[in-house]
């Protein structure tokens, strides 16, 4: 259950980060309206706050989060960008998520 809680929180965190970076990309690369920078800033602030909800040390949290970020970014690639995933994408995400689980579920020192 702990792994599920961590993964869901990381997934929300990743979506907040991706939205916060994707909206400025739309403004700068596709000429979308500048007002999109406001929700982008709010999304990045949400991203930073969500990272603080994890009890682990910041560096460990960021390291474990990276695995989930990779998987969520690939889901974004498929659903938002409409790009089909390759077996290499799926395999890489599986490896990254395994790494996240190893880091996030390590025994706690007393």
Swiss-Prot record:
InterPro entries the record matches: UPF0060
Signal peptide: none
SUPFAM superfamilies xrefs: Multidrug resistance efflux transporter EmrE
Membrane topology summary: Multi-pass membrane protein
Places the protein is found: Cell inner membrane
A Gene Ontology term for the protein's cellular component: plasma membrane
Membrane-crossing residue ranges in chain numbering: 8-28, 33-53, 65-85, 88-108
Keyword terms, alphabetized: Cell inner membrane, Cell membrane, Membrane, Transmembrane, Transmembrane helix
Domain of life, per lineage: Bacteria
Stored NCBIfam families: PRK02237.1 (NF002586)
Annotated family: Belongs to the UPF0060 family.
Protein name: UPF0060 membrane protein Rpic_4131
Organism in which the protein naturally occurs: Ralstonia pickettii (strain 12J)
Lineage start: Bacteria, Pseudomonadati, Pseudomonadota, Betaproteobacteria, Burkholderiales
